[in-house]
């Protein structure tokens, strides 16, 4: 049974101190996710252990959207909503039923106030194949189906729940979404330094090359998706951990706690700057060589402007891709 939310459904995303703002609003139509990915911040937060789904129709969601659009006063005409931050968008079919209601509410208000909206549904599941009625896009409201992708060895190591789709099925889901007329996006978030072959300088270089080989192979395997005219955006982000996550994972000897991780200005642990820049630059250069048109649709998530600059990537917002 869906609950009534006591706080806001819609909030501007707080990226953290110094992190580039991509212009998203987060829609908390549900909270928590029991897929159990080892790196997910929800496992280490105060989120309920059992996922909670909110009743949008009985709550204040419609009023919040109305206020947001009406108060923009022409200054903000493009809105990007992320419905996959506080839970997996397609965790269950009941989740999707609430999402469908949410999309229709936003569509109605967008037409009323003459604004354009993108709504991102983000998932690691293959539940899109179970959906009977796919939401349609129109001029005012476009739905983006995004899949979080990782090499299969990373999935098997850190995403062990049997409800999580293997890599190939996630890519198949993207193709299916395209066939249904949806826009699609790919999120390589988080890029995880795995396997670690050793801690000497030479061994870290070797591990980096293995990582890059695996992620380039992943991108190659979905090149048809990347080259689709309905492809919206590609985002890269290496692993980041809260202080509490890092402490817990380090205490239990998790392979997520790579020794070359440092506390950043936003209070999150990340790989060292040289490692992050190397990974991003190599993947960006790969995209430039295989699908150069995608550079204008490529972003770094949860990164600082000096990292974008070091990678020679122009800072952009998701709303600029409308």
Segments from the language model and where they lie:
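Conserved Radical SAM active-site core
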Residues: 2-25, 41-146
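Short cysteine clusters
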Residues: 33-40
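Hydrophobic faces of well-ordered beta-strands that scaffold small-molecule active sites
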Residues: 79-83, 119-121, 145-147, 184-188, ...
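A short acidic (Asp/Glu
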Residues: 92-95, 130-135, 157-160, 194-213, ...
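Conserved C-terminal portion of the radical SAM core fold
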Residues: 169-245, 300
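Auxiliary Fe-S-binding modules of radical SAM enzymes
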Residues: 216-322
């Amino acid at each position: 049974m869906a609950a009534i939310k006591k706080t806001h459904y819609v909030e501007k995303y707080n990226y953290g101190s110094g992190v580039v703002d991509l212009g998203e609003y987060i829609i908390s139509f549900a909270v928590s996710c029991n897929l159990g990915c080892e790196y997910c911040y929800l496992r280490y937060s105060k989120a309920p252990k059992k996922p909670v789904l909110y009743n949008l129709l009985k709550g204040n969601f419609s009023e919040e959207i109305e206020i947001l659009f009406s108060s923009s006063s022409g200054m903000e005409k493009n809105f990007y909503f992320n419905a996959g931050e506080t839970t997996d968008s397609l965790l269950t079919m009941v989740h999707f039923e609430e999402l469908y209601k949410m999309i229709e509410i936003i569509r109605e208000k967008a037409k009323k106030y003459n604004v354009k909206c993108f709504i991102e549904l983000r998932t690691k599941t293959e539940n899109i194949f179970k959906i009977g009625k796919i939401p349609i896009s129109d001029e005012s409201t476009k739905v983006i189906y995004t899949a979080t992708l990782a090499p299969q060895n990373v999935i098997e190591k850190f995403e062990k729940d049997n409800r999580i789709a293997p890599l190939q099925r996630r890519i198949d889901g993207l193709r299916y979404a395209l066939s249904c007329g949806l826009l699609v996006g790919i999120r390589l978030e988080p890029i995880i330094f795995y396997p670690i072959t050793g801690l000497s300088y030479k061994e870290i270089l070797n591990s980096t090359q293995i990582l890059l080989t695996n992620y380039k192979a992943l991108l190659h395997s979905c090149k048809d998706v990347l080259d689709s005219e309905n492809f919206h955006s590609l985002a890269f982000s290496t692993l980041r951990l809260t202080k509490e996550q890092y402490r817990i994972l380090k205490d239990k000897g998790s392979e997520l706690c790579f020794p070359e991780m440092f506390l950043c200005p936003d209070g999150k642990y990340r790989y060292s700057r040289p490692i992050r820049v190397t990974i991003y630059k190599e993947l960006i250069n790969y995209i430039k060589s295989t699908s150069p048109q995608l550079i204008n649709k490529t972003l770094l998530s949860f990164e600082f402007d000096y990292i974008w600059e070091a990678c020679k990537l122009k800072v952009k917002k998701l709303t600029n891709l409308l």
